[in-house]
Amino acid sequence: MESITKVSMSVCPFVRSTSTQALRQLSQTSGALANQARQCPIAGNAIRAKEISIRSYSSATKPARATAATPSTPEATFNVTSSFELGSKETAFDYNGYLGNELEKKRSDKSYRYFNNINRLANEFPKAHRTQEEDKVTVWCSNDYLGMGKNENTLKEMKRVLDKYGSGAGGTRNIAGHNSHAIKLESELAALHKHDAALVFSSCFVANDAVLSLLGQKIKDLVIFSDELNHASMIQGIRNSRARKHIFKHNNLADLESKLAQYPKSTPKLIAFESVYSMCGSIAPIEAICDLAEKYGALTFLDEVHAVGMYGPHGAGVAEHLNFEAHLKSGIERPEITTVMSRVDMVTGTLGKAYGVVGGYITGKTNLIDWFRSYAPGFIFTTSLPPAIMAGCSASIRYQRATLKDRIAQQKNTRLVKNNLNELGIPVIPNPSHIVPVLVGNAADAKRASDLLLNKHDIYVQAINFPTVPIGEERLRITPTPGHGPELSKQLVEAVDSVFTELNLNRINDWKKLGGLVGVGVEGAAKVEHIWTEEQLALTDADLNPNVVNPAISPLDVSSGIST
């Protein structure tokens, strides 16, 4: 009978909010309220169950013999359907209707996502074909920033390992999925960021979620400070951590410090932020954030997803770029000075953007990485990346470490596009990075602009709408690569200009009349300087330290577990 009461509590709000003592009193009285309650098919069952329980407890019985736990018998199972005497007019919850309504909401607010069938051609980069192979377009929004998806070195190594070791890893890292390719990749990543150790995940979304949630769950009283523009993966991890959190204004050091100062230095803290924010192209003040972290006793968690491969003399990201000369001189070795990169506690990155393959990772001190390896469910309970994938990632890292030409070509092509669009009054959101965000300001217009570029001009640029960006700040996100030279850039600029005219979209002067938005048309705004200087863009591979070419990198013990 106890099961009847439990089921009633799960179904009826009256029973759920009524104490056991109150139910007992109702079962022993005959007032109007009690009589009405007995008429309810749900509350009545709970009251009758309590009556039987009371009678049973009051009767003389033999002492019960203690027995081992046994499986439940069919008689002990409460059949909800038969006991509630469902009427013929009752229907089940309309699951499909609910889902349809939710989807209709997204269609109504123009945030419903349509996927374009775009098949990138390795031998014709940056070309792709649509559904029909003869229907070719130029891709201008890929995150394969350096075109490494077609790199001969990477493809050759992947094919070699695929032929020898097969298509899959065969299991988790703990059960048959750990191999020399995983050890090598983690060793390469640790060497790239000049950290002690690294750990590879299936994606950086998983890495961010797994690491941040674990830190918040395990470190008692941890307080997390998160930039308001952080990626969804970081937001998800912080939410799953259940730790106390503070959201600070984007790249606002004063706001961050005011929040850090609310806690004693002894309170564990973590500052989570990105180096390059992918939808606006802004770059974090990493060094100043490290200063605040040291002042207030906080760990630093830096997401370099949109920066690895793109910045620094060896592609380690913005943290490396901030000490460009020191890292250029030392090559694979750690510089003699304290660098920004060495001050950051944790760096997460991706192998699926500038490196052109797939996967995510985190780097840091040995104990920290071993702790994640030992405790993070997102790492422990998932199948390892295939050997061919990890081999391809290692090949990409080694290739980009030993060359500057792709990063420099990409930066030059980015500047060409930005300058030419600005000359025509196309509203490029100002930023110092490789991202070219073109402000539209309306979801429907952003979708129409993207469709026109694709269907009329054979140019694929994806519209970016809510929730990726705030409502009213919808945009087109353009990402030049080394393969987008002057001729392709000319075609793009002419096409965007044509679309803005055809749809009568706001240009820079129009936004200026409206008071400006996200840096576009803002009176008196300071000029934004690119992070790559003219001197750095003039460098060649001959300026690199020779020790970055095919270096011998020792395998990390922590990748397999450290013996004591």
Curated annotation (Swiss-Prot):
The keyword Flavoprotein does not apply. PROSITE patterns: AA_TRANSFER_CLASS_2. GO terms for cellular component: mitochondrial matrix; mitochondrion. It is found in: Mitochondrion matrix. GO terms for molecular function: 5-aminolevulinate synthase activity; pyridoxal phosphate binding. It holds the Pfam family Aminotran_1_2. Keywords: Acyltransferase, Heme biosynthesis, Mitochondrion, Pyridoxal phosphate, Transferase, Transit peptide. The modification N6-(pyridoxal phosphate)lysine is found at K353. Homodimer. Pathway: Porphyrin-containing compound metabolism; protoporphyrin-IX biosynthesis; 5-aminolevulinate from glycine: step 1/1. This is 5-aminolevulinate synthase, mitochondrial. It comes from the Eukaryota.
